[in-house]
Amino acid sequence: MASMRDIKRRRDSIQSTGQITKAMKLVSTVKLQKAKGKAESTKPYSDLMYETICNMLARSGNINHKYLQAGESERKAVITITANRGLAGGYNTNITKLITESGIPKEDIDIIAIGTKGRDYLARRGYNITDDCSDVINEPLYTDARDICDKLLERFADGQIGEISVSYTHLRAHETE
């Protein structure tokens, strides 16, 4: 049977763990709000861009452009955007699950990894990581996105890949996550 001292020590340990957990929750809430603010600030721009492209395609009729046609190759390039660290809930898992459960043989997929968690997970499962851009995840710039796109479009034009996809999730309200 535990002595009174052992019980008191265990109680103090549990209270201490509770305080640490509460502090971690506060820090994660602040980080989430900051990330959410950044994501929401780009939404009007991306919505208008999407609407503009849809209107242009609807009004222009049949467009014959090499980037709107299926490529010659069976290989597919997939840009995966995950976190560099864990503790992101199901975010990293959901992104990698999109790829692993896509039904496409892993031999036919080239992964462009943005974020170490997705890169490491997919590499362990035998996927071909052709590009690692994990260093851009913390402070992404337009030039970083352009460089990644330029490389992919060059590979598409050369016939090395026949399709380019992006695996991503949508930001929902915090209460529903």
Label every model-predicted segment:
Residues A2-R172:
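Conserved loop-to-helix interface motifs that mediate assembly, gating, or partner/ligand docking
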Residues A173-E177:
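A short, hydrophobic C-terminal helix/tail in secreted or cell-surface proteins
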